[in-house]
Amino acid sequence: MEEQKKRTAREIIENYDGPAVRIMEVCGTHTHEIFRLGIRKLLPKQVELISGPGCPVCVTPVSFIDEAIYLALEKQVTICTFGDLVRVPGSQMSLAGAREKGAKIHIVYSPADAEKYAKEHPKEQVVFLSVGFETTTPAGCLSVKKAREDGLSNYSLLVANKTMPQAYQALKGSADVFLYPGHVNAITGTALLSLIHISEPTR
C-alpha cells in the first residue's frame, strides 16, 4: 500500500501538465532535505524549485562581520560565535583572518555556551554574535537573562537577527509559491503569516 502511494505521487509529479510554477523554500532544513532526497530531479521541467535565503549566516551583512572584527581587534573583546560564521568575509577579512592576527574568536554551539564562557572568564569582555531567524533568537535572549541572574557585567550580544515576514517582503515577486518553515510558526504562531503580503510574481 505504501509503495502504491509512492508510485502514485511520483506519477502525479511526472505527469504534471499545468502552467509553469516557481516554488521557493526559505528554510535551511528544507534546502538540505530537498538536496538529500533528490527532489529537484523528480520535478517536471515547468516546475522550478528555488532556494531562498534560508541560512541566516548566508545573509549576514558585511557590516556586521566588520563590527565584530573591530570589537575583537581594536577593543580586545572575546567573540563567541557559531563555527559557520567564522569564514564569512567582511570588507577586509573574515573572523578567521582576524583570529590569525591575534583576535580571540571562540567557537560555541549555543548562546548558553557563550554565557558560560563569560562566567568562567570574568576578566574578558565576551560578545556573542547573535544571527538567525525567530527560532534561534529566544536562546540569545535567554542567555542575556541568565547572565543577569549570574551577575555578569562582561557578557553582551552583537545582534543581526532577522524575521521571516520581512524576508518574504524582500522576496515578493520572486516566486509563485513559498514554502513556509513550520518551526518558525512554533515560535511565533500562525498569526504572523497575516503580515505577509506577496505581490504577483514578475516574469
Question: Could you tell me what each predicted segment is?
Answer:
Residues 1-123, 137, 158, 168:
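Metallocofactor- and cofactor-centric catalytic cores in central/energy metabolism, strongly enriched
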Residues 194-202:
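Residue-level detector of conserved catalytic or cofactor/ligand-binding positions
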Residues 68, 143, 198:
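Aromatic/hydrophobic pocket-lining residues that form π-stacking "cages" and hydrophobic walls in ligand
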Residues 76-81, 85-87, 181-194:
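Extended, charge-rich low-complexity interaction segments
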Residues 129, 133-192:
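Phosphate/pyrophosphate-binding betaalpha-module
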